[in-house]
Amino acid sequence: PVWLVADDPQAALDARLALARIGLDRVEGALAGGFPAWRNAGREVATLATTTPRKLAERLKGEGAAILDVREESAFQEGHIPGARHVHAGRLEEKLDDLGLDRDEPVAVTCSVGHRGGLAASLLARAGYTQVSNLLGGMTAWNKLDLPTEKAA
């Protein structure tokens, strides 16, 4: 399930609709008052790591990282980072054990522009993956820099 954090009810509704469009329809509720209310209650706020296309490309040349692409199947087929594994963001939780990812190895998540990737990275972190990052700008930013891609076989 997903819980939303939004500063106002309309923003929560808009987010719920946007998530439903990508197959994430298990929204349980929203935090009234958003982050200010959470912080004012003395609650901890977790953050997720991000990486840029250039940094990720350099990492892949060196120590490496697993790449998880959470876009639609058709977008993945058209071109993805070489060696990337694929699962649609809306099916990540149910398919997680089938992906063969190591919970203690680096995993970089990508989507089209970074929104779904951020959500998927959050789900991975919650599932115990310790070195997760979201690719800033997603495949749009990767492709603008003409970094390597491959098409699905």
Residue ranges, per PLM feature:
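Rhodanese-like catalytic fold shared by cysteine-dependent sulfurtransferases
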Residues: 1-66, 70-153
